[in-house]
């Protein structure tokens, strides 16, 4: 596409050089800029990428978007704008032909449950023989092909490219985990959502947002912006068991479907039965009551299942068809995942990293604990420490607790575990500043019949260490290796 055509929608700009050049790529990553690319520089929290403009010029890039004029060769066109990332969004959606308009787009937000709900929607679509894509904490997936991702919600250009990739692969729908960071930072500008789903709102990310009010406002942006084009059928799915849904109902102009277990809602779960093999319940709907069975464990997953079913149903699939699909879904990786049922202990990994998430996790497993419940939890570095003692208090619902860091980054691991220990309500705990050693200790003290829960990371494949270096780490593999060494069995899978 000709650059002059691309920039027609950008009204506030100063152009230094010629826009008469062909463009086939936009990037915010200086390492990928080349001839035919537009490089968009920005001022981030840690890095000002304007300093890479000369490097991209050396790589053959002839067009940069900047917030102030740079000292560059005369053959490099500079487009100076006040907000480079907002312009990046406009350019990306224009160049890639508004890809989110070409499929059904589901957006899932909330403190806990985003990954589970989003993954369930994707898996239901696949069971229905529909081409589907997923993007979130567990990476990027088109049908069954997976690639890793860096952020729950990538920056705007990368996100648009992923949606375009899904469209080109024939995806009929795409499900996005929508983080509060992504909403506030404008990473989702221009994405056309068809269905927005809310799970819950509990304390998290106050290091970024400052207050719960600001955090809640960030989440609400998905719902308030959903109605920008009222000519399309768009829907909102809200959890009535969370009081924040009342506010979200007031900010969206779209039709709302509610679900709940404890509070009255249009769609409800009754007569709940739970085990470590899954759940069953009566799904009470405006159209009748249906029996639902699922391999997902825990009462909180019933809420997630309902949210996913309603979202898919809202776009035209019958509930009967969806329920059949739900009964045969695969587990969501790293979400209340029981590792190797042949072991004499119940070894479980989960992503729970807030007090609310941990409470729900313990609620889910405690009825099935045969002997002791051993619970390992970590605290992330450079995050909101005000939530940490409450996490320690909740963890002490278990018989024995192990406190570790989780992605300590530049914080002192001993400080992080000490913050967790401030909330301890009994003395049956120990602190490890090395998470892997903490996991090995959990297995070492476990006896047949015990339940060992490794919380906070799920299947996240790394630890963020000082200097923000990512070091390979897998809770599940470390736990299984230690368990096989102690109890026999194996080998450890990948």
Swiss-Prot record:
Catalytic activity: UDP-N-acetyl-alpha-D-muramoyl-L-alanyl-D-glutamate + L-lysine + ATP = UDP-N-acetyl-alpha-D-muramoyl-L-alanyl-gamma-D-glutamyl-L-lysine + ADP + phosphate + H(+)
Entry binding sites for ATP: 110-116
Residue positions binding UDP-N-acetyl-alpha-D-muramoyl-L-alanyl-D-glutamate: 30, 152-153, 179, 187
Pathway: Cell wall biogenesis; peptidoglycan biosynthesis
PTM description: Carboxylation is probably crucial for Mg(2+) binding and, consequently, for the gamma-phosphate positioning of ATP.
Record-listed N6-carboxylysine modification sites: 219
UniProt short sequence motif L-lysine recognition motif, positions renumbered to this chain: 406-409
Keywords of the record: ATP-binding, Cell cycle, Cell division, Cell shape, Cell wall biogenesis/degradation, Cytoplasm, Ligase, Nucleotide-binding, Peptidoglycan synthesis
Location(s) in or outside the cell: Cytoplasm
GO MF annotations in UniProt: ATP binding; magnesium ion binding; UDP-N-acetylmuramoyl-L-alanyl-D-glutamate-L-lysine ligase activity
Broad class of where this protein is predominantly found: cytoplasm
GO CC terms of this entry: cytoplasm
Any single GO BP term: peptidoglycan biosynthetic process
Function (record text): Catalyzes the addition of L-lysine to the nucleotide precursor UDP-N-acetylmuramoyl-L-alanyl-D-glutamate (UMAG) in the biosynthesis of bacterial cell-wall peptidoglycan.
HAMAP family: MurE
Protein name (database record): UDP-N-acetylmuramoyl-L-alanyl-D-glutamate--L-lysine ligase
Source organism of this protein record: Staphylococcus aureus (strain MSSA476)
């Amino acid at each position: 596409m000709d650059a002059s055509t691309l920039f027609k929608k950008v009204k506030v700009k100063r152009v230094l050089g010629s826009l008469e050049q062909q463009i086939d790529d936009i990037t915010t990553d200086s390492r990928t800029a080349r001839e035919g690319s537009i490089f968009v520089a920005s001022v981030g929290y840690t890095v000002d990428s304007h300093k890479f403009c000369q490097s991209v010029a050396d790589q053959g890039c002839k067009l940069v978007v900047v917030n102030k004029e740079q000292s560059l060769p005369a053959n490099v066109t500079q487009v100076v704008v006040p907000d480079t990332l907002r312009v990046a969004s406009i350019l990306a959606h224009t160049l890639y032909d508004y890809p989110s308009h070409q499929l059904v787009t589901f957006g899932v937000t909330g403190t806990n449950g985003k990954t589970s709900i989003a993954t369930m929607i994707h898996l239901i679509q696949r069971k229905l023989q529909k081409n589907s894509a997923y993007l979130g904490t567990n990476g990027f997936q088109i049908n069954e092909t997976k690639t890793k991702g860096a952020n729950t919600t990538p920056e705007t250009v990368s996100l648009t490219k992923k949606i375009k990739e899904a469209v080109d692969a024939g995806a009929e729908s795409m499900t996005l985990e929508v983080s509060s960071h992504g909403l506030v930072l404008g990473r989702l500008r221009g994405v056309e959502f068809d269905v927005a789903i809310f799970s819950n709102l509990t304390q998290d990310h106050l290091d970024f947002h400052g207050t719960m009010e600001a955090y809640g406002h960030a989440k609400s942006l998905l719902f308030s912006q959903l109605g920008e084009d009222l000519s399309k059928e768009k829907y909102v799915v809200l959890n009535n068991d969370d009081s924040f849904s009342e506010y979200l109902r007031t900010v969206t102009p779209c039709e709302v479907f509610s679900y709940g277990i404890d509070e009255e809602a249009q769609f409800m779960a009754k007569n709940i039965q739970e085990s470590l093999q899954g759940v069953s319940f009566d799904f009470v709907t405006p159209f009748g009551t249906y029996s639902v069975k699922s391999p997902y464990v825990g009462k909180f997953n019933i809420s997630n299942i309902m949210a996913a079913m309603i979202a898919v149903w809202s776009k035209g699939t019958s509930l009967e068809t969806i329920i059949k699909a739900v009964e045969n879904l695969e587990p969501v990786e790293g979400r209340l995942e029981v590792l190797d049922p042949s072991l004499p202990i119940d070894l479980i990994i989960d992503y729970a990293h807030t007090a609310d998430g941990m409470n729900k996790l313990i609620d889910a497993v405690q009825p099935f604990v045969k002997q002791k419940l051993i619970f390992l939890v970590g605290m992330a570095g450079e995050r909101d420490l005000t939530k940490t003692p409450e996490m320690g208090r909740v963890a002490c619902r278990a018989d024995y607790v192990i406190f570790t860091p989780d992605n300590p980054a530049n914080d002192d691991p001993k400080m992080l575990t000490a913050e967790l220990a401030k909330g301890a309500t009994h003395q049956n705990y120990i602190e490890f500043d090395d998470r892997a050693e903490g996991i090995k200790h959990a297995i070492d003290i476990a006896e047949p019949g015990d339940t060992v829960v490794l919380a906070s990371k799920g299947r996240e494949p790394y630890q963020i260490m000082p200097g923000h270096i990512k070091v390979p780490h897998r809770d599940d593999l470390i736990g299984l290796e230690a368990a096989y060494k102690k109890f026999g069995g194996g080998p450890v899978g990948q």
